[in-house]
């Protein structure tokens, strides 16, 4: 049981900086200004469900995609590391706010015409929470843990769905409490936390690249 908690804790530490619910909160507040409370709650729940579904598909179908296209684990690690590091640099040195992204602008125009338009999948679930970096990390981690003997087989079966469920619950709670979070932390606090998470992502991305290169060297040495 202790191994299960360790696996869940490790998974949350890896995924939460990438998912970054606080950035999604700021985006949600910018897009849901004209929605009533019931509609906001519905969008929050749907976004969380979509995030859980995306992560589950990425984890269980990722290996099939790799096998189909002949992608090696070192190659995936290097590619995933580049994506994660790039996202980290963008969070560390932001050039635009989440609300100014093309997806958010498109939804803003749609909301002007139809205030009850669905913002749960795009942009809240994807790309804000379960974007390319999150998906690449999940696929790469799935390939790594299946070859690892660190955890028992039953832990590797139970932990991933629980991790994805907890990330979805954290996102749901953050969106439901978005107003309170913004009042408590403020825009400056969210930016500071996002930059800290960005630094962590750069470190994680670089380490992914190093691990991929080392595996290639071992293979051909």
Curated annotation (Swiss-Prot):
Cytoplasmic topological domain residue ranges: 29-44, 90-118, 176-196
Similarity comment: Belongs to the UPF0056 (MarC) family.
InterPro entries hit by this protein: Multi_antbiot-R_MarC
Membrane-topology annotation of the record: Multi-pass membrane protein
Name of the protein: UPF0056 inner membrane protein MarC
UniProt keyword list: Cell inner membrane, Cell membrane, Membrane, Transmembrane, Transmembrane helix
Any one GO cellular component localisation term in the record: plasma membrane
Residue intervals passing through the bilayer: 8-28, 45-65, 69-89, 119-139, 155-175, 197-217
Main localization of the protein described in the UniProt heading: membrane
Gene name, Swiss-Prot/TrEMBL: marC
Organism lineage string: Bacteria, Pseudomonadati, Pseudomonadota, Gammaproteobacteria, Enterobacterales
Keyword Nucleotide-binding: no
UniProt organism field: Escherichia coli (strain SMS-3-5 / SECEC)
Periplasmic side: 1-7, 66-68, 140-154, 218-221
């Amino acid at each position: 049981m202790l191994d299960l908690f360790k696996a869940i804790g490790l998974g949350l530490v890896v995924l939460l900086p990438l998912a970054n619910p606080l950035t999604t909160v700021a985006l949600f507040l910018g897009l849901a200004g004209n929605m009533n409370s019931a509609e906001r709650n519905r969008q929050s729940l749907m976004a969380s469900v979509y995030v859980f579904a995306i992560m589950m598909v990425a984890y269980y179908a990722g290996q099939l995609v790799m096998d189909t296209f002949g992608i090696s684990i070192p190659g995936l690690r290097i590619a995933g590391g580049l994506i994660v590091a790039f996202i980290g640099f963008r969070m560390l040195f932001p050039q635009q706010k989440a609300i100014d992204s093309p997806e958010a602008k498109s939804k803003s125009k749609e909301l002007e015409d139809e205030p009850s338009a669905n913002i749960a999948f795009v942009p809240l679930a994807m790309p804000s929470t379960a974007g390319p970096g999150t998906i690449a990390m999940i696929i790469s981690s799935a390939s790594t843990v299946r070859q690892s003997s660190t955890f028992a087989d039953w832990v590797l079966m139970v932990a991933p769905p629980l991790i994805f469920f907890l990330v979805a619950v954290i996102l749901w709670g953050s969106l439901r409490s978005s107003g309170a979070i913004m009042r408590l932390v403020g825009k400056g606090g969210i930016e500071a936390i996002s930059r800290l998470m960005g630094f962590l992502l750069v470190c994680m991305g670089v380490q992914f690249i190093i691990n991929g290169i080392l595996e290639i060297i071992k293979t051909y040495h």
